[in-house]
């Protein structure tokens, strides 16, 4: 309750007040975990019933051992009495006859006791099943709810919350931390109550059977309890720190994998590995400290336990010799207290797992409890029957939550009449996109009012508000599904006819119909299978299908080529009819027909009016237009025939999509996409169909830690041997009382044996500490190394591997988080436990064969049944672990996609759809969990019950052997305690089955990825590294299809050449293969036929790292990393330490220095996840600075200035022109004014070069290029 009250009290606090921590918050920070009952906050009545029944069953199961000890004590007295009567009385016939009577009586008594054992065993068979299966069922049901609640809570947060939280950590928590909660609230709690019940029942039996001896032993118990409590407290603290470090590492991995093209292009793999390794190192150090602390406590606990044995037998002997207690009473008390104290040892691992779960639940429940100030799921707020679309911004002030010190809007006033189109113009970062975000209520203004039809939008229902708004953003986000489904995200229940209509309006219909699966084509992660222009057109169709009252176009045509833009612009003009529209555009030709054009400067509007009015005012707008117009003036020549050019233009429009090629576009896996979707389960099954790794295979992963493992195994063997040694000492004490020695001799012998117990305790203290420390350290080193090596192997793969839908960011981060942890789970403390149990049982059997082979053979016959049940459990759980892993990867993909693209999800009001998809993806893991509960319950109960049945067989047969003078009772007890306690330990080893099963699956994945050598190996040291690069590039008859879409040709015999220092411009319609040329030069892929040459050498012969080091790239949609601006720019050259002077020089050249200097933290300002804290233009300029700092020999500019405003573009274009001097440069641009000065312009169509020449030469040809220029010029 304390946890829940704490968070409800803080729910209404602004999450932005991150810097100010109250004392209460500081206290929370020091002890961040959830209350015990708070862990079960999502249990319904059925879950509670399962938990209550499971707990009752666990309590009954726990009482079975102490109950057994009562039977055992009475049985021991019968044995002792009979043996004392049998062995000395063998002198004459009458005494022999008397012995036979006693022997017969002993066998009858033992038969009765055997029935008691069997009855208890039958009870255990039932209650152990209920205990395990019911707790697993309750956990499975609650975890399903927690996953859904947590995902709902993430979907419910406002954008400002995401600005100050690491998205990568959220995905790690959704997979890793929820799994920890699952471990903590399942069968381990049943085991906990079982151990508690055993402890309490054992002491009750002890007091009833002999209160004096029990009190003496109890004197040691508080010390054992105190050490356990201290251990649990320290463990919780270390666990939370470890989780935080792994969450940070997971965030780094996700960020890197999501931006893999950027990382590979700039050779950033080693830098990212270092960044990842830094967080892993922190987690490893905490984990080692945790292992040391834990095992000191365990060592102390065993020392105290053995000290209590010594005390018990020393005092017990005096009680027997004084005839106060019988031997049976002493043993009943001793064994009851023994099992009671052992149960404390069993409590400790369960407390550890529960402590881990409480630490993991803290952050998860904290997010679930966080109530956003803008609640997109709220049903409150006004829902007007009709919306006219009158908009007003009144004295609006705003700062972004993550940079509250920087004011973006400083008193914005703007009115938009219903049906009007208002264009917002101004330089990058002046607040245009912010205005659009405030209208969608992604943020609330810090001051002022935004209203629709005179009503403050804060009083309107959030979902209703967003549903009446259609948005097309500067960098459109598509989801990893089909084209039709992506458009359907615009509006639920939309018909196929409406989808086709919207697609035609967005000029996307033709290219879609050319694809093999048309509307059922998969677009890939973030739409990666399509070109920028194709993505943009689908995004426009998605907005149009919404039929919105208000249309927001934020650079909606920025990624389109000239021809497509003309048609789409016409479609948008048509779509704007009758709608209130706000347009943001740097290309001013697209806004000249707006009813009102508003000029932004310094966070306020400084001028308003239509195109003609503002041109007369000679203000900001006029200046921008003049700059752009001058840039677009082209010498068309007096012979330019307008009608002819129109004809060619119209031909081009229809020709444009005759090419089946699609650019990055055509990339990867549209072919067969529908079949992929249908056959996903089959393909994934094949993917997973790798031979499961053997135990030795898993051990090999840890082989570099062999010194730790050797010491750990030796200590585990010693600890395992302690139980058989205990059996020898224990049976020796029994023998003292069955022999007819004088009391003094008996006391001396018992004192000696008690001293042995004390020595064993001291040995255990040392060996348990070293066992835990060495295995703990080896486990942490293994986890760190495996995570590092898997991540390294991922970064080694070529781009085609990442194109595969099975290797999405979500799937890879899920594997990265879970695989290493699963292997560690089987190799650290689990391996220690297995080694200990094998040594225990093995040594026990050997000793038992020496002292009583007949009884040993009977027990060895029973043992395979126990082992068989463990093997069955492992096999079934192994299959379940594989299924769980695969299915949770599916849900991980959905969650990652939704969280990474949260702004788009919110704008489209599709939070509920993603929740439904996520909930649906959890159904199979959920059903598997329920099935696994029953299987685990059956195998566990059988294993536990077999112990009791073995007691019955052992003592029944033992009675026969004693009665027939084949064995002494002392030896029966030795064999019994050595073999049966060893078998109990082996039975407990079956609880390792789920961990070992998971480890086998995970190890197979790890080994497979580590052994996978890509065809283009980024880490390879092979290949030529010429001393000098001139920069001559030649493509000779290059044929290329993307690996995941082999049936769609992209380049069909492309040949082109650019000489050293020349600038080559590639033009053509969207999807014609322009960006493919750049990707082949970067060696993201290799051509299927033909050759790419660099300075006359085939690039396949060149060292990949060397090649990429000489290339600088600026992409159409630049990706920045969540670090400082300086670090992002320095990322351009990862081969050295880039100085601050170089960073600033590159920033000045890219026209971003002045903006950076205006920020409070200047170059140390963090840019946010994927650069979300910056405008599109600002991101682009930082990306340009990043490329320039590289000082490349060859510069690749793929729409490098597409996101810039006119003013910035002019300056940056000059910077790029200057940067091109002395360098070979390949430019891709839709804005033809930016490439007029190129040495060579190549027009690509159908994957081939159709025209080439200079600007003037191509104009003179009056071909495709001429018509494109004409179309662009006509619109100015």
UniProtKB/Swiss-Prot annotation:
Signal peptide: none annotated. GO terms for cellular component: mitochondrial inner membrane. It is a multi-pass membrane protein. Keywords: ATP-binding, Glycoprotein, Membrane, Nucleotide-binding, Phosphoprotein, Repeat, Translocase, Transmembrane, Transmembrane helix, Transport. The modification Phosphoserine is found at residue 22. The chain crosses the membrane at residues 52-72, 119-139, 188-208, 215-235, 296-316, 325-345, 709-729, 755-775, 831-851, 852-872, 935-955, 972-992. Residues 635-657 are annotated as: Disordered. PGP isoforms differ in their drug transport capabilities: PGP1 and PGP2 can mediate MDR, while PGP3 apparently cannot. Energy-dependent efflux pump responsible for decreased drug accumulation in multidrug-resistant cells. Belongs to the ABC transporter superfamily. ABCB family. Multidrug resistance exporter (TC 3.A.1.201) subfamily. This is Multidrug resistance protein 2. The gene is PGY2.
